[in-house]
């Protein structure tokens, strides 16, 4: 589903849109790679800067007799809360929830949930600072 005032710039790759839910007032800037096979919810007032990847799938590697490339994929939903800014070049991995009023710093790799009212950055992403209420 798609809310109001959703701006998707040229050069954005979107896959499995039937599994993606957009809120209102969302901007997705050029060269983003967004796939929703595992389920993706982007709430309202979200800005996704250029060159961000959002992935809801991953490779498993449990069958040692099969190349990793051919092991089954896993699927986990990603949730991006209200009032979130995801800065350029960030990677949001499957199974992550970014809670309300959060900032993901440029170049971060988010592999765990992001607390509300906070800034996360780094590889892997860690809490940098709580935002003042």
List each language-model region with its residue ranges.
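Extended, small-residue-rich solenoid/repeat segments and analogous flexible loops
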Residues: 1-13
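C-terminal/domain-terminus segments
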Residues: 97-121, 125
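Flexible, glycine/small-residue-enriched loop-and-beta-strand segment within the central core
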Residues: 11-22, 27-97, 123-124, 131-132
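A generic "structured core" feature
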Residues: 7, 85, 93-94, 103-105, ...
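Short, electropositive, low-hydrophobicity segments enriched in small/polar residues
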Residues: 7, 40, 112, 125-126
